[in-house]
């Protein structure tokens, strides 16, 4: 039976440090005026203009991997999601906090778009 083709971005697997059995995501900000691109769990992210943005294929200076977002919706509801809906704004222009796996010693599982040799296991992935 062939492997299932179900792309999921980068999924945290484990850390290389002895104390990092639990993956930890650190907090960053998205432009509170409403960044116009959706970001999904497992997407690579970069800094642009001081805020987190979704990385394009081949982007340099990757900050890390998007985990989830927290903000207070315009109706006053505290909101946690595993994706950032495009052009979201928070109540009163408040902060939109995104959580990013940014530890350089974090290992991830990622789906390839073709056959991979055994020698690829444990190596870096090219995002082009």
Name the predicted role of every residue range.
Residues 1-128:
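Surface-exposed, low-hydrophobicity beta-strand/loop segments enriched in small/polar/acidic residues
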């Amino acid at each position: 039976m062939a492997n299932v083709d179900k792309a999921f971005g980068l999924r945290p697997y484990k850390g290389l440090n002895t104390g990092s059995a639990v993956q930890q995501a650190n907090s960053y900000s998205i432009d509170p005026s409403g960044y116009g691109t959706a970001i999904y769990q497992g997407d690579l992210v970069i800094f642009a203009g001081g805020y987190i943005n979704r990385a394009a294929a081949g982007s340099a200076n990757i900050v890390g991997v998007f985990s989830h977002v927290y903000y207070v919706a315009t109706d006053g509801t505290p909101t946690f999601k595993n994706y950032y809906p495009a052009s979201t704004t928070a109540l009163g222009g408040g902060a939109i906090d995104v959580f990013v796996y940014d530890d350089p010693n974090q290992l991830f599982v990622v789906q390839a778009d073709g056959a991979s040799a055994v020698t690829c296991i444990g190596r870096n992935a090219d995002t082009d």
